[in-house]
Amino acid sequence: MQYNFKVEAFEGPLDLLLHLINRYEIDIYNIPVAKITEQYLSYVHTMKELQLDVASEYLVMAATLLQIKSKMLLPKQEEDVPDNGEDFIDDPRQELMERLIEYKKYKQVATELKEREQERAQLYTRPPIDFTSFQQEEETSLPLDVTLYDMLAAFQKLMRRKKAKTPVTTRITRQEIPIAQRMTDILQQLEVRGGRQSFYDLFADEEREIMVVTFLAVLELMKNQQIIIEQEHNFDEIFVSSSNKSV
């Protein structure tokens, strides 16, 4: 059964690279190309496995990373060293690093502008606030913004678990479930569970086809803002909550 889900509603290849850099706490000025390439290709492979409509830019970036990786493995040529004896480093990562730094700045500015816009909207529309309620309020850390790539990482983890449990010989019963039906099922399941549950609990049925449909249904619900995805810290468990918003 063919499922098509457009990734364009989420992010692009530079976002994926920044996600990996943040997730694995990598120094953006000293990117381990072999590691980042392996992780990047793993994500792209998962997107293609899920039959997501992967933009060509992802594949171009994959080719760029492989090219940089191959250049990093080449021995230094004598002609690359200047005659004056000064150290000269022609780093194949330089252009990519500059693009990432520039894009990171752009993302930060965009986030700040969005926050200011939200603050202005609250200033003119919200009713007076009773500030006494803030006096005894303790500081709490807000959940991380969960992206498509966090969700893909969680799905990869699910598939690794399934692979470890799957016997050598299995009988596959192919079931076709419409994504819209699975979306309804998930919302009903959340309602029964009090509006919030673990992301992994949505995958009680370990049939691969159903797992794929469930994951795509979660992405659609995210895109429609019908559910809220929360994760306290990197690698922590992901929770799904109903936003009580109908479409």
UniProtKB/Swiss-Prot annotation:
**By its UniProt entry, which InterPro entries does this protein fall under?**
ScpA, ScpA-like_C
Q: What is this protein called?
A: Segregation and condensation protein A
Q: Which GO terms describe its cellular component?
A: cytoplasm
Main subcellular location = cytoplasm
Task: Say if the entry is tagged with keyword Cell cycle.
Answer: yes
This chain's source organism reads: Bacillus mycoides (strain KBAB4)
Q: Which GO terms describe its biological process?
A: cell division; chromosome segregation; DNA replication
Annotated function: Participates in chromosomal partition during cell division. May act via the formation of a condensin-like complex containing Smc and ScpB that pull DNA away from mid-cell into both cell halves.
A Pfam match: SMC_ScpA
The gene from which this protein is expressed is scpA
**Keyword match Cell cycle:** yes
